[in-house]
A protein has these predicted regions:
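Conserved S-adenosyl-L-methionine
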Residues: 209-220
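Conserved alpha-helix/loop element of class I SAM-dependent methyltransferases that forms part
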Residues: 26-49
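A short SAM/SAH-binding and catalytic strip from SAM-dependent methyltransferases
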Residues: 133-146
């Protein structure tokens, strides 16, 4: 039962994801992905799977994978200082409160068993967190200084399927070879490199995935009305090459 105090807490938190909580309360997230889930390529059922959500934020995808039957690890960072800030965009003052308040509240309300691990994808290894049958990463890689290293780490963690959904650059996608545009000098969202579609595909192959399938292109709409182009990929490795 959600109390009045919890209702106020939900309303006061800043949410990245729109989550439908027990008793029908809905968080005011920057992105409402509920009607877009079919575009991302999660299996209908994930019973018996061990799944990883890279860059979980409020946990929308982690909780969804758990609902579908998976045992889920959710990866994110607690301290704003540990994020990949471009030097000229780095805040002079950081909040004292740890990130992940929305995730922790939602986990409690859902009665979830998802484990949130405070760890950079750069440092995530099988020795640290094990391997996974299914790895999901959505709208995270574009915010990283070293996208290829992150993909290499994901490939090392994945013993099954990796599903990616990331923003892409339409101009770079026209060029007949893999390129990315540099964005870290812009006074906008924290983005270092915006790859073309071909670039994403080649990076995933370079990182260790033998089969990289483009699953679709779509737009993700924000609460304020603007939208972001995304491209989806499904990646697997050849067992014989492992």
């Amino acid at each position: 039962m959600i109390t009045e105090a919890v209702t106020r807490q939900v309303e006061e938190l800043g949410w990245y994801h729109t989550l439908e909580l027990p008793d029908g309360q809905v968080t005011k997230g920057m992105f409402d992905l509920r009607d877009q889930m079919h575009r991302y390529g999660l299996p209908e059922r994930m019973d018996g799977m061990r799944a990883l959500d890279v860059g979980t934020w409020d946990g929308f995808w982690a909780f969804e994978m758990e609902k579908r039957g998976a045992e889920v690890i959710a990866l994110d960072l607690d301290d704003e200082r540990d994020l990949d800030w471009p030097p000229r965009r780095r805040p002079k003052v950081f909040p004292d409160t740890p990130r992940g308040a929305g995730f922790r509240l939602a986990k409690e309300l859902f009665g979830s068993k998802v484990e949130r691990v405070n760890l950079s994808i750069y440092n995530a290894t099988p020795e640290e967190i094990g391997q996974f049958d299914f790895v999901f990463c959505g709208s995270v890689l574009i915010h990283l200084r070293d996208q290829l290293l992150a993909l290499e780490r994901i490939a090392g963690l994945c013993r099954g399927t990796f599903v990616s959904a990331e923003e892409y650059d339409p101009l770079s996608s026209i060029v007949p070879f893999p390129v990315s545009r540099y964005f870290a000098d812009r006074d906008s969202a924290v983005v270092y490199w915006l790859p073309g579609i071909r670039t994403w595909r080649r990076m995933m192959w370079t990182a260790g995935f033998d089969r990289v399938e483009q699953t679709g292109k779509f737009r993700v709409k924000a609460r304020d009305g603007w939208s972001v182009r995304h491209v989806g990929h499904r990646c697997t490795k050849d067992p014989a090459a492992s």
